[in-house]
């Protein structure tokens, strides 16, 4: 577990309407007993039990659920060298591959429980799990040749929607040391799959050290600034023993680099205590600090149980908050192109970039605004084309001085045909009241026609819709006729 004490206050971005990750679907997690989190998930969420996180991940830290690429692996799918990113350029940092680049989660051969968490639970064909060969090279880009291309586990999705979280019991093959597991979720209603690589460390990587046992780890999870400090929290049977804490205060920018302070803290521990050691063990009682993750060993018989890492972040960082108002849930298409009339109000200096995409991910409008603390500014975004269907407003908020991404939010809205609704007998204007649709329900669709939900067993498809899964949308979805009868 990692404890962070900080004077920085993080304020959520305030929005005038519901935000959702539209181009977002699912990732390998460990919320309810999953054995290990994916590389992408650890870019956003701390590891269960240790608090470790991946760093310098790029934009996937905001949407680990979106690592989606072409299906058909291994025959097709993402190209070699881009498997971890699913071939998406915005997630290319995931393709970096060295023996010490990523957090590794403990793994054992045998039956293990893998967990997926979904933000949009599509109809599923199957899930497949692959693992690297024992002799793979962890310092080369991930290619098909690194993997055993026969999945060690395959779970059928039965072409049905799974619950929002699923677990798979899989028999993991024997391996040693650092390996990568590739989890593939093949969606059943699109030509896409989701690719999650999982970095794992099998038992046996750390040498057996007589009279010593592993009690923790110094993981270089982030760079620190001058004045910040990192320290150990040592626990025995009675709880935390603060007298045994070792603290390292950062004095220079170079010392604050993650691998450097990890080395220095391990070195300081070894210089102070006889019953605590940190670094790479040689099996003969010698411990050498390294520039990277340093295991912490406790002397057997010392009464010590574990060591955790804490941070004292005293360097203040500016608070940022952005209020966006004026975005409607629905816009009617008229003679003129649709225009979004928004108002932005900033807390903290920031650079804001707004982009409108249609459901095909075409950019239709872009606006860039620099706001000072307290500024309020009207923004007009005229769309390059106005066609019925689902659209997204993507807002990227960056620090105006450094250009670093603070937050990214996606908001949904729809364009509909203009004019008064046609005369006719219908119960809902699609997709209003979606969860209430049953056999015989009549809806006015976005094409201006009226559709009736088919009888059982097809009626269940009528409620299977989301902005990112539109195959059963009446009149326009690829499989709309499976669920609906056109009435006019």
Curated annotation (Swiss-Prot):
Residues 1-24 form the signal peptide. CDD domains: LPMO_AA10. GO terms for cellular component: extracellular region. This is GlcNAc-binding protein A. Residues 25-202 form the Chitin-binding type-4 domain. It holds the Pfam family GbpA_2. GO terms for molecular function: chitin binding. Its main location: secreted. Probably interacts with GlcNAc residues. May promote attachment to both epithelial cell surfaces and chitin. Belongs to the GbpA family. It is found in: Secreted. Keywords: Chitin-binding, Secreted, Signal. It comes from the Bacteria. The keyword Lipoprotein does not apply. It comes from Photobacterium profundum (strain SS9). Residues 439-480 form the Chitin-binding type-3 domain.
């Amino acid at each position: 577990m990692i404890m962070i004490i900080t004077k920085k206050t993080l304020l959520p971005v305030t929005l005038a309407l519901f935000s959702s990750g539209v181009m977002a679907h699912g990732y390998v997690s460990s919320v309810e007993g999953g054995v290990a989190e994916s590389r992408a998930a650890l870019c956003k969420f701390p590891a269960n039990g240790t608090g470790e996180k991946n760093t310098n991940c790029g934009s996937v830290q905001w949407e680990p659920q979106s690592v989606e690429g072409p299906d058909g692996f291994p025959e097709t799918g993402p190209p070699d060298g881009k498997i971890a990113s699913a071939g998406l350029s915005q997630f290319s940092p995931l393709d970096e591959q060295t023996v010490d680049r990523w957090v590794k989660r403990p793994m054992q051969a045998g039956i293990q429980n893998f967990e997926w968490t979904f933000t949009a639970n599509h109809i599923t064909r199957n899930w497949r799990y692959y693992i690297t060969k024992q002799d793979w090279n962890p310092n080369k880009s991930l290619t098909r040749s690194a993997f055993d291309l026969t999945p060690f586990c395959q779970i059928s999705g039965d072409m049905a929607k799974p619950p929002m979280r699923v677990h798979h019991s899989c028999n993991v093959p024997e391996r040693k040391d650092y390996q990568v597991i590739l989890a593939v979720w093949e969606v059943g209603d699109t030509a896409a799959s989701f690719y999650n690589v999982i970095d794992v460390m099998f038992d046996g990587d750390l040498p057996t050290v007589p009279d010593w046992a592993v009690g923790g780890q110094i993981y270089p999870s982030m760079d620190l600034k001058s004045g910040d400090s990192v320290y150990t929290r040592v626990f025995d049977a009675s709880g935390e023993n603060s007298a045994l804490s070792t603290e390292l205060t950062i004095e220079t920018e170079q010392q604050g680099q993650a691998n450097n302070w990890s080395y220095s803290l391990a070195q300081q521990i070894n210089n102070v205590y006889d019953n605590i050691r940190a670094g790479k063990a040689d099996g003969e009682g010698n411990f050498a600090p390294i520039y990277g993750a340093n295991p912490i060993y406790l002397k057997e018989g010392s009464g010590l149980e574990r060591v955790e890492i804490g941070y004292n972040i005293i360097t203040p960082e500016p608070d940022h908050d952005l209020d966006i108002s004026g975005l409607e849930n629905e816009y009617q298409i008229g003679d003129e192109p649709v225009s979004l009339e928004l108002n932005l109000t900033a807390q903290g200096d920031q650079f804001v970039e707004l982009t409108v995409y249609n459901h095909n991910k075409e950019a239709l409008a872009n606006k860039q605004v620099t706001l000072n603390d307290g500024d309020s500014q009207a923004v007009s975004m005229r769309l390059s084309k106005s066609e019925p269907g689902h659209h997204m407003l993507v807002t990227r908020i960056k620090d105006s001085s450094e250009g670093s991404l603070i937050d990214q939010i996606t908001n949904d809205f729809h364009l509909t045909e203009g004019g008064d609704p046609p005369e006719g007998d219908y119960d809902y204007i699609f997709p209003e009241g979606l969860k209430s649709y049953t056999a015989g329900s009549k809806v006015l669709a976005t094409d201006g026609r009226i559709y009736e939900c088919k009888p059982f067993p097809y009626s269940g498809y009528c409620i299977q819709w989301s902005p990112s899964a539109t195959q059963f949308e009446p009149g326009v979805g690829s499989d709309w006729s499976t669920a609906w009868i056109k009435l006019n």
